[in-house]
Structure formats: C-alpha cells, structure tokens
Amino acid sequence: MSTLAIIFALVIEQWRPLGERKSVSAALAGWATSLERAFNGGERRHGMVAWLVAVLPPVIVAAVLYWLLSAVSGILALAFDVAVLYLTLGFRQFSHYFTDIQLAIKAGDIDRARTLLEQWRGASGVVRSREEVIRLSIEEALVAAHRHVFGVLLWYLILPGPSGAILYRLAAYLAARWKPVGSFGNFAARAFHLLEWPAVRLTAASFALVGDFENAVFCWRTQARTWSDSDTGIVLAAGAGAMGVRLGMPVQEVDGMQARNELGTGDDADGPFLDTTVGMLWRALVLWVAVLAGAAIVSAITRIAT
C-alpha cells in the first residue's frame, strides 16, 4: 500500500502541482512564530519544549487517524496517505525554479537566470557568472530533491501511515526557521540532524547507484566531511561525483566571500549538466519505486505461499 500511495501522490503532484504551497508556508510560519514567542526564554530546554509541542501532536494524530482509517477501510487509509504525501512530497515544490533557470540558460538569457537564482536562494546582490549560476542551481536542486522527496520517502516508510512524512517536513522547517534564534533553536537543529543521518546516506547511495558509482562513493568519503554542514555535504558530494561535475568552491555573498571546498570531480558546471541533474534525480526516484514495488511483490508472494 505504501508503494501505491507514493505513486499516486507523485502522479497527482505532476498533474496538479501545489507549487510553493504558499498558504501552508504562511500557516507554518505563523505557528512557528507564536511558539517561539510563547516558549523562548533564551535556553535550549525552552526550544525543546516548543519543538515537542509543534511536532508531536500532528505526528501522533496522523498515526492514530491512519490506524482508525485502516480499521474501517484500506482504501480510506490509502487516500489519507496520498493526501498527506501530496502536501509533503514532490519535485514540483521546487522544480519550477530549476526548470525556468534551465530554459533561461538554453535561451542565453543569463540575466533572467541570475534573477531566478536570487529568488530561489535569497537575494545576495552579487552579479554571478554563468558557470556560478549553473553550479549553484545544481546544488540547490540536489538539496531540495533530498529534502522534498527522498528524505520524506524514507521517514514515510519508517513510521506508521504518513506520520513519518509529517515528522520529517516539520523537523526540517523548524530547524531552518529557528536556526537564527540562538540556543532556542539548538534542539530543533539537533533533532533534524538525527533524522537526516540515515536519510542523507540513503539519498547519496541512490545517486551513486544511478550515476558513476566509484566517483560518487569516493567524493562522499573524502569530501563530504569538509563541507560546513556535513549532512548537506554528503548529498552534494555524492551527487557531484555521480554526475562527474565540480560543485562547491568559494562564492561571493552579501556579507563577503564564503569559503567553500570543492566537491565532485570532472568538468566545470555547464548547461548540459542541468539536464544531467534532472535525469539523475528521476532515475534515483524510479530506483526507489522499483525497489519498493519489488519488495511488495515478494511480500505478497510469500504470504500466498504460506
């Protein structure tokens, strides 16, 4: 049933995408802000309480509701799974930026590509070169695919019903939202890091399996630890190695030059690597679905045989 829910959610999202989910984002932002105001006393334990209040109720409610629906009808439980996955999972949550940048690069409109990248990453006021625009766009796409697709899938499969998908997306949101708040945000960051530990490694392994395996594993093992955020570094290093492209490297930001180590091996980022990125992400997703479908078939055959 999990495989069917994933397939249905992805198909519906491709047919009728929810885009950036602005209404959902606005509701989450208001909720996170109100919790911060209510609980933030400047200590780590206050952040822990706020995180538990924010995350546990929806996760528990989702698990209980799924259990109740399963007791009534498998179809209702499946529909609930699909509905939640539709809100939490999918390429179309971020791919419009990447696709528009891809089209702008192909059309030779570097100014539009720069503008789109600024909207995606946040304004920096820096005039970037064509190679920088392509390189940073690929980095954003790899991380976004992990956060919006593969990480969600893993935790959906681990916990009952759609509760894992809700847990992962809420944890990711709160970690980013409360990051600037000092010690109050420490627990959210730590909790998300724990959820990311298996997720980033499975995403990296997926990239390796559908790309250049040896390069991906080499870059993962030797380069990921040099990145400022080791979780993100694993995804970027494995993705860059799998595609044979050079990512990372220092970039100019509003507050000065940001030192970043080189990730990947091979060629400088150029237009064709945008297509390569899309192909690798889709192959990785197909791999996940194929493995899940195969496991479901084997399980069904085993039950019939016994």
Tell me the role of every PLM-derived stretch.
Residues 1-306:
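Hydrophobic N-terminal alpha-helices or hydrophobic patches in metabolic proteins across all domains
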